[in-house]
Structure formats: structure tokens, C-alpha cells
Regions:
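Conserved helicase NTPase catalytic core signature
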Residues: 1-124, 134-138
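Conserved helicase motor core of SF1/SF2 NTP-dependent helicases
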Residues: 55, 80-124, 129-364
Length: 364
């Protein structure tokens, strides 16, 4: 029995799930159930870690690790004896350093060892996008840092995980205890123009999201543009036209400049197709080919969901059908966070393209 088997066995047996979690309704059981042998997901990682912790180490693997550690201890003792024999026992070079050098092990190898060892611990851990972590995620991280020395970076207004953090005190007090952690809030917005920052902040406050009082350092006239069209098909053509103009203004052949389109999931493929068929008329075919062949992680023109752009910034952003983005979210607060993320990505220009019906459904 190992952690993978345990989690797989749990998810593939709905009757067992019902017995172990009687508070779940039929929809909850159905959402968790999957075929036996199905691939593990990102959300399974902390559950696997918990299962491995409860089950304990695999005896075979534990024996291999013990043998490896014993060999390492012998090598370090031999190295220490050697250093002592030449009068260098208390010098700058330690026995551990000498063994690493003899075995060809440097900092990179140590990092590889840490990645391969589930029980490896650290003196300090830096967590980014911390608002997205669930209670089980935090349990996994705390195991890696027994000293509980953390630098935690996040924005609770951007929380999209249903089990994430909406208030820092509720999560931090449980993890570290009251008055045993410090909160420092950023109050200066260097990314967004004042016009974009004000729009996003007003929306977040009305939606019930917690945000710090932020002052933007730049003002750019016409930084926010709102475009209303007749139907959803018109939003695609209009967004593509604006992307072409924004690309001409902000995207350079030297690889600098970024434009992003953020839209509901069902519109992403038609948007991407229409945009790259529109670009040649503005940028020429050669430049369009260059842009279309870029890797997704470094694309100068990106088309994606709110989740795909979190943590990134762009010179210009086109948000398409924000009301539909809100409608597709799993909860009201997640919807608000998704839109707040979308509106706070641009450093220069925010364009909102939507139908009149979409505008009626959500005022921005």
C-alpha cells in the first residue's frame, strides 16, 4: 500500500467516499469520483503527501535511503579524519564540502536531492500567489519548514481557488498563531495607470473583495476604452481589430511588448483564429508569422482565460464579454476575483469589448 494507491482507491469507489464523507451530497460524490487508474491532478498533490505521511515510508525505499545515508556518513567521517590529519580540521573546508567535491556534487545536485526527497526540509520558504493555497496545501508546506519561517506573497482580491484565502488573518492565525506573523500591505501601484487602477479598485470594493488602499503613480489619458457591439460574433471581430492596432503600437520585432486577450473559455479558439487572420492586414504576413510561431510562455500576443494570465503583466489587455466571464465562474466571489485579475494586468491600456446585453448584466 502506498499513497498513490490509497488516493486512487478512494476516488474510484463512490460508496467508500460516501461512507467516509457522509456530508457530501450526490453531486459532490459525482464530482470527486473518477475511473480507477485515472491520472493524478494538481489538487491531488497535497492529498498524496498527507497519505504518504499517514502511511509512513515504504520499507524498501526506507532501507535504500538508510543505506545511502550510512554510506554518506562513512564518507564524511573519512573526509573529516583526512582534514584532521593535515591540520585542516577546523578550516573553511568542511567534511561535507569535501565529500560533495569528491563526488562531483554541487549546489545543483543538492537541489536535485531536495526535489527527489519528499521529507526534505528548508530553513525558510517563500510562497508566491499564496492566496490560492488550500488548507491541505498549507499542511504540505508547513511539513517542509518546521521552523515556520515563511515569506508569503499574495493578493486576497485575486483568489480564484474555492478553498483559498479571502482574509489573511483567518489563514495565518491558524498556521502561525495570533501576533506571531506580520502583515505588510502594498499601497503604491506601479503597474497600472490611475484610470485602470481606479476602475479595478471600485469594482473590487463593490463586489466585496478586500483590497488595500492603492495609489497609482502614473496617469495615461484614454487608458480605459469601452466598446459596445451588437452580438457575440461582433465582439470577436472587434476584439481582433483592436488587438491588431494595439500590437502595432506596443509590440516590437525585438521581442518586447505584450498584448493579451482575456475572454470566456468558449471564445478562446475563435478569437485566436480571428486575431491571427486579421494581423497581416496591419502588421504584414512576415511579422504575423513570427508572432504566431512564438512559444505560449513567451508569446507577445496571448489569448487566454483569467487563470492563464494571473501574475503576469502586459502593455495592453483586451477583456471580452466580462459579464460572461462572471457567469461562468464557480462562485460570485471567484467571478469578482477573476475580473479583478483581468482588469489589473495592463501597464498602458485596457480595452473592454462586450455586447449591450453583457453590459446590462455587469456594470463596469
Amino acid at each position: 500500500m502506498n499513497g498513490t494507491w490509497l488516493i486512487d482507491n478512494l476516488w474510484s469507489h463512490p460508496l467508500r467516499l460516501r461512507a467516509l464523507a457522509p456530508w457530501l451530497d450526490d453531486d459532490g460524490i459525482a464530482a470527486l469520483t473518477r475511473p480507477k487508474g485515472a491520472p493524478m491532478t494538481q489538487s491531488d498533490v497535497p492529498l498524496l503527501d498527507e497519505a504518504m505521511e499517514l502511511l509512513g515510508p515504504d520499507p524498501k525505499i526506507a532501507a535504500q535511503i538508510a543505506a545511502k545515508n550510512a554510506k554518506r556518513a562513512q564518507e564524511e567521517q573519512f573526509a573529516q579524519d583526512t582534514l584532521n590529519s593535515v591540520g585542516l580540521g577546523s578550516g573553511i573546508v568542511s567534511s561535507q564540502m569535501l565529500v560533495d567535491q569528491m563526488n562531483g556534487e554541487g549546489g545543483e545536485f543538492i537541489a536535485q536531492r531536495a526535489a527527489a526527497d519528499r521529507e526534505w526540509t528548508y530553513g525558510h520558504v517563500v510562497v508566491d500567489e499564496a492566496q490560492e493555497l488550500t488548507a491541505m496545501d498549507w499542511r504540505m508546506l508547513i511539513r517542509r519548514c518546521p521552523s515556520r519561517s515563511f515569506t508569503i506573497v499574495g493578493d486576497v482580491a485575486q483568489t480564484s481557488a474555492l478553498g483559498g484565502t479571502r482574509r489573511w488573518d483567518r489563514t495565518m492565525n491558524r498556521l502561525f498563531g495570533e501576533r506571531r506573523w506580520d502583515l505588510n500591505e502594498l499601497t503604491i501601484n506601479y503597474r497600472n495607470p490611475q484610470e485602470v487602477s481606479d476602475l479595478a479598485s471600485d469594482f473590487a470594493q463593490k463586489a466585496g473583495l478586500y483590497i488595500s488602499t492603492v495609489n497609482a503613480v502614473r496617469t495615461i489619458p484614454d487608458a480605459v476604452r469601452r466598446i459596445i457591439v451588437d452580438g457575440e460574433s461582433d465582439t470577436i471581430a472587434t476584439a481582433a481589430s483592436h488587438v491588431a492596432q494595439l500590437a502595432k503600437q506596443f509590440v516590437d520585432a525585438d521581442g518586447t511588448g505584450r498584448v493579451a486577450v482575456i475572454a470566456p473559455s468558449h471564445m478562446l479558439d475563435p478569437l485566436r483564429s480571428t486575431i491571427f487572420s486579421t494581423l497581416p492586414g496591419t502588421l504584414g504576413q512576415q511579422e504575423t508569422n513570427r508572432l504566431s510561431e512564438q512559444h505560449e510562455w513567451d508569446a507577445q500576443i496571448s489569448v487566454g482565460s483569467t487563470e492563464s494570465v494571473k501574475g503576469l503583466e502586459f502593455d495592453a489587455v483586451v477583456v471580452v464579454q466580462p459579464g460572461r466571464i462572471e457567469q461562468d465562474a464557480p462562485s460570485r466571489l471567484v467571478a469578482a476575483s477573476d475580473l479583478y485579475v483581468a482588469m489589473t494586468r495592463p501597464t498602458q491600456r485596457l480595452v473592454i469589448v462586450r455586447t449591450g446585453e453583457d453590459e446590462t448584466a455587469l456594470q463596469l
